[in-house]
């Protein structure tokens, strides 16, 4: 019968040096199956579920206002993740132009690897084009998302100017 537990080779000088420095484990050979998967994981999962249910029972907060089926809201807004798209379609004078702007976004994203192909670095500080495109996109998307929640006359300037 083969050994299930892996025993360390304590005659190995590299292992001895690591253990002297505090690297490595003080114990060896405890398998993940069945100890972790059958005993620890269910306890963590049940603890997480009971914590979420307990917090939901102790503080039953409402998710927004109750809806009134007989009253139409003044302005119908999409879900939060569609605010930037809604803002572009709302502020562009031609709807065809708004749709064309929406199609240029994925096309521009597909061009980034080809533009940045000359730079082989993975560090974002050494990839100025990709970093600047990413930062501009994040700021512009947040600007559009915040502007979508404001009235249309303040939406482009966010009421700041």
Curated annotation (Swiss-Prot):
Membrane-related topology note: Multi-pass membrane protein
Keywords: Electron transport, Membrane, Photosynthesis, Thylakoid, Transmembrane, Transmembrane helix, Transport
Gene Ontology CC terms, in alphabetical order: plasma membrane-derived thylakoid membrane
Transmembrane helix in keyword set: yes
Protein's UniProt keywords contain Repeat: no
Spans through the membrane: 37-57, 96-116, 132-152
Location in or out of the cell: Cellular thylakoid membrane
Gene3D superfamilies xref list: plastocyanin oxidoreductase (1.10.287.980), Single helix bin (1.20.5.510)
Function: Component of the cytochrome b6-f complex, which mediates electron transfer between photosystem II (PSII) and photosystem I (PSI), cyclic electron flow around PSI, and state transitions.
HAMAP family given in the database record: Cytb6_f_subIV
Family: Belongs to the cytochrome b family. PetD subfamily.
Name this polypeptide is given: Cytochrome b6-f complex subunit 4
Organism expressing this protein natively: Acaryochloris marina (strain MBIC 11017)
Organism lineage: Bacteria, Bacillati, Cyanobacteriota, Cyanophyceae, Acaryochloridales
């Amino acid at each position: 019968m083969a050994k299930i537990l892996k025993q360390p080779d304590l005659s190995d000088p590299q292992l001895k040096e690591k253990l002297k420095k505090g690297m490595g484990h003080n114990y060896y050979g405890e398998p993940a199956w069945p100890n972790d998967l059958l005993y620890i994981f269910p306890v963590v999962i049940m603890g997480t579920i009971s914590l979420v249910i307990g917090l939901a029972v102790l503080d039953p907060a409402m998710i927004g206002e109750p809806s009134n089926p007989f009253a139409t809201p003044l302005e119908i807004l999409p879900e939060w993740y569609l605010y930037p798209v809604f803002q572009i379609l709302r502020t562009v004078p031609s709807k065809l132009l708004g749709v064309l702007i929406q199609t240029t976004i994925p096309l521009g994203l597909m061009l980034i690897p080809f533009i940045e192909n000359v730079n082989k670095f993975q560090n974002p500080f050494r990839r100025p084009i990709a970093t600047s495109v990413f930062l501009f996109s994040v700021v512009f998307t947040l600007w559009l998302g915040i502007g979508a929640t404001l009235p249309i006359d303040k939406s482009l300037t966010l009421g700041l100017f």
